[in-house]
């Protein structure tokens, strides 16, 4: 047995059991190298459809395809060893029917070898979540601000900032939990509402722009590292890597143009004649 196969990955049931316990730490990753770094400190790695923004420069996540998600899911699985890897189901891969969702989820899990999928939606997607969960597909829900619905929402804005708007979001949370999801992401929801939902439902809540009272937190890796030119209000910059990377690229370009690089220590000499 290889060393890698001997290491036990975290599972969806283990994350489910963290409700009310130690906070679940989750970050995104789309590459084997960053996955290896994230894996050392995080319980869950999300291969998010935010890769459309971060990797491909799309304005929204709508253009992301199933094949794109599977490809990056494979990379993250190869780079990580212990974290539960969750892959987003992209827009158009699950909404038409629960059967379509199952077919897409099976492709993701079989071809990437990930441990769970994530899909957006509450009450309207509850039947689909139940259908998948009953057929061996662990599902992480996603409510509040749902980026795949940008063309319906019109803009990315926080949800539930007036108490009169709480009921539909609370209903979404209950529906996802009762349908069998093992956890749910709550995005850009007013803090008091996120806190209330966390207290009211039986599965872990993973906050992103929600509340410190949530059962866990998630951020986009590039946002928290300072690699994105802009980040939402809810992002804390834990690093400022952008300027350092730019400085390194500038130094490289300057040394190439001045022929300072490569130096003698970076090239190969001839073998000594015997």
UniProtKB/Swiss-Prot annotation:
Catalytic reaction annotation: 3-methyl-2-oxobutanoate + (6R)-5,10-methylene-5,6,7,8-tetrahydrofolate + H2O = 2-dehydropantoate + (6S)-5,6,7,8-tetrahydrofolate
Gene Ontology cellular-component annotations: cytoplasm
Keywords: Cytoplasm, Magnesium, Metal-binding, Pantothenate biosynthesis, Transferase
InterPro entries for this protein: Pantoate_hydroxy_MeTrfase, Pyrv/PenolPyrv_kinase-like_dom, Pyrv_kinase-like_dom_sf
Cofactor stoichiometry and binding remark: Binds 1 Mg(2+) ion per subunit.
Pathway noted in the entry: Cofactor biosynthesis; (R)-pantothenate biosynthesis; (R)-pantoate from 3-methyl-2-oxobutanoate: step 1/2
Residues the record marks as active site: 187
Top-rank taxon: Bacteria
Cofactor(s) required for function per UniProt: Mg(2+)
Transmembrane segments: none
Cross-referenced CDD domains: KPHMT-like
Purpose of the protein: Catalyzes the reversible reaction in which hydroxymethyl group from 5,10-methylenetetrahydrofolate is transferred onto alpha-ketoisovalerate to form ketopantoate.
Summary of subunit composition and partner proteins: Homodecamer; pentamer of dimers.
Protein known as: 3-methyl-2-oxobutanoate hydroxymethyltransferase
Organism of provenance: Rhodopseudomonas palustris (strain BisB18)
Organism ancestry: Bacteria, Pseudomonadati, Pseudomonadota, Alphaproteobacteria, Hyphomicrobiales
Gene for this chain: panB
